[in-house]
Amino acid sequence: MIPLFSKVTITSIEQIGSKVVDITGDIPFEIPPTWMWCRFGTIVKMRIGKTPPRGEQVYWSNGKHNWVSISDMVEGGTIKAVKEKVSDIAVNEIFKCYPTPKGSLLMSFKLTVGRTSILGVDAYHNEAIITIVPYADVNNIFRDYLFYILPTISNSGDSKDAIKGKTLNNKSLNNLLIPLPPLLEQKRIVTKIELVNSKIKG
């Protein structure tokens, strides 16, 4: 169950356990009645990356695994190449997991807040970047919707302050309010944005 409901003309409430809380003051703008506000952490799984110690060359020499930093991220685009790679030892001792797969959504949440990119290669990434995996998606429609709206949502009002505050942790990200339209509306929004972008580029 998604624990956040929006009644834009009356009030907005959130159920936390058995308690119902009025969060009308937290809602940044009105949305259509068929949409709802959701906490980011209720609709996606997030994974924060890591940086192997720079002083330990064993983690960087003979690197064969792609490692993404913010400078590698293509704003509003696809990451097709990286500047650095990490070794098998780094994978086994630091990351201890498979790389983030090609096609995944990444977002920076430190320094350059809200930059989104799609991975064009399997890769690991640093701790200023999160991998975002929707709990439910169809043909990457929700992924693409988040790809386009997160730069705006994460840099607007209280959201920006929450992410860039002194306490940077999963809680700040989990509490981001995301306007969630029905799936077909998400698809229409993505299609319209891509059409506008294509006209701007050329």
Regions found by a protein language model. Name each.
Residues 1-19:
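Extended, domain-scale alpha-helical bundle/helix-rich regions
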Residues 40-45, 74-81, 96-102, 118-124, ...:
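Basic, amphipathic alpha-helical recognition segments used for DNA target recognition
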Residues 112-115:
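Short, charged beta-turn/beta-strand-edge "cap" motif at the junction between a beta-strand
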